[in-house]
Amino acid sequence: MADPKGSTSKEGFGDWCILEADCSDIENDMEQLFERDTDSDISDLIDDCDLEQGNSLELFHQQECKQSEEQLQKLKRKCLSPKAVAQLSPRLQSISLSPQQKSKRRLFAEQDSGVELTLNNEAEDVTTEVEVPAIDSRPDDEGGSGDVDIHYLSLLRSSNKKATLMAKFKAAFGVGFNELTRQFKSHKTCCNHWVVSVYAVHDDLFESSKQLLQQHCDYLWVRGIDAMSLYLLCFKAGKNRGTVHKLMTSMLNVHEQQILSEPPKLRNTAAALFWYKGCMGSGVFSYGPYPDWIAQQTILGHNNAEASTFDFSQMVQWAFDNQLVDEGDIAYRYARLAPEDANAVAWLAHNSQAKFVRECAAMVRFYKKGQMRDMSMSEWIYTKIHEVEGEGHWSDIVKFLRYQEVNFIMFLAAFKDFLHSKPKKNCILIHGPPNSGKSSFAMSLIRVLKGRVLSFVNSKSQFWLQPLSECKIALIDDVTDPCWLYMDNYLRNGLDGHYVSLDCKYKAPMQTKFPPLLLTSNINVHEEANYRYLHSRIKGFAFPNPFPMKSDDTPQFELTDQSWKSFFERLWTQLELSDQEDEGENGESQRAFQCSAGSANEHL
């Protein structure tokens, strides 16, 4: 018979089990026991402090929550297991509208063989679910905005919103946004014409914008395809990009990121045809007449042939009539005339704009110089004072001369000989201390008669006297000792009123007379013995008193163009200036100077 399993009876192991302990006298010694206890390495083994109950309620609450969570997981596993849904249709796992990623948080805690695994260490078993975007199921009449929400989501998901909008624009209209517009880098640059594309606009706001924008625009072009809306806005006043965006966002209730805005291409025929042909199709709303830049490039008419040819004589005539001789002024102002003048448009389209501007300025100077030489001093003064607008009073000049202790009768006699360029009397000197009004008085006279000012600082150049050949009256302001010495050495004949040889740039020396020359200086040349040969050639008047000013720092005597105009009109006879009616043909008005070819449609 086999041995029974397990241990044997008590008799079997009585040999090795010690039934009684040995007694020792050493352990019975109490003193040694206490000493051994104090030498122990374990301190505070027994806690003798008072006991506290602790937060047992919180522990109980945690245990209850853990138990409830376990019961809830079991209930979900039993009733709502996703594996049961996948078993009904296994092909659902392969259907997905967008790439899916494994969920980082598990909804169901699975158990295997009755042992619950932790959520962090368990391998996930996730089923692929079909995602369908939530669309507002409300009908349109109840304010449903499901389609607009889809457009917003597609825009928000894109990393480059501008590129996304441009791609959608090209897909909708069949043409790139940059093909219709030119780029403005700055948001502060103003322009009257703007191309605006807005994405995902509500239909009601889109329709209302067609009426609201009419009060801001002279021309309006609107079209909407799918989610894209395109506007061509020709505003009544220039606006920058920030102002346009502010207007559109407030009117259409959209964000600024949904807007593309640039000015249109004004000189591109293909772009102009896009807007022109768009008006002929259905679905486009337009308001107002075509802008000029569209009409000129798309509509054929009798003006096209004329606009394509540039007439240089018309440009010269325009500059002559507007008294323009500077190249910069001619170029800028003629370019601004382009919207109104077909010849200016043709000039802008020409490749030789700078060449025409230089030649135009040169021709105007030639005509002005010839016109000046053809006029007498009386006719010149009459012409210039009638170009002055407004009225003044001649007494301001007379009062100022009397304030400076100048005998007005003597000044009037000297001024008469000065204007008529009598020999040895065509040079007047005004001298006195600083701040006495010498330069103000002389400059006001030169300004109204369109004279020239010479500066001795240019005396190192042999052409510094060239302006004397291009004016009727001249001024050298603030003459000092070096200038007096130069005049004493080289300008005696010129001050006498005789012919001199004047060297001009790019020309041979020419024979001419000095015009009436006005001088201002702090030096009384008549008291200087070194310049005794100039005493008989110069008539001097002293201004000893400081120039008077009002309490508001304005001049007490108004030496303006209007004052000189009234002065010449009042003293025309005393200055022995010729009557302009006698110089004309029986008082009849003479025809203005014309340097352009006459037109066939010109009035007789």
From Swiss-Prot:
A motif (Nuclear export signal) lies at residues 88-97. It catalyses: Couples ATP hydrolysis with the unwinding of duplex DNA by translocating in the 3'-5' direction; ATP + H2O = ADP + phosphate + H(+). It is found in: Host nucleus. PROSITE patterns: SF3_HELICASE_1. Residues 578-604 are annotated as: Disordered. One of its GO terms (molecular function) is ATP binding. Residues 406-556 form the SF3 helicase domain. One of its GO terms (cellular component) is host cell nucleus. The keyword DNA-binding applies. Residues 144-307 are annotated as: DNA-binding region. A motif (Nuclear localization signal) lies at residues 76-78. The keyword Phosphoprotein applies. Its main location: host cell. Its EC number is 5.6.2.4. It is an enzyme of class 5 (isomerase). ATP-dependent DNA 3'-5' helicase required for initiation of viral DNA replication. It forms a complex with the viral E2 protein. The E1-E2 complex binds to the replication origin which contains binding sites for both proteins. During the initial step, a dimer of E1 interacts with a dimer of protein E2 leading to a complex that binds the viral origin of replication with high specificity. Then, a second dimer of E1 displaces the E2 dimer in an ATP-dependent manner to form the E1 tetramer. Can form hexamers. Interacts with E2 protein; this interaction increases E1 DNA binding specificity. Interacts with host DNA polymerase subunit POLA2. Interacts with host single stranded DNA-binding protein RPA1. Interacts with host TOP1; this interaction stimulates the enzymatic activity of TOP1. This is Replication protein E1. It comes from Human papillomavirus 36.
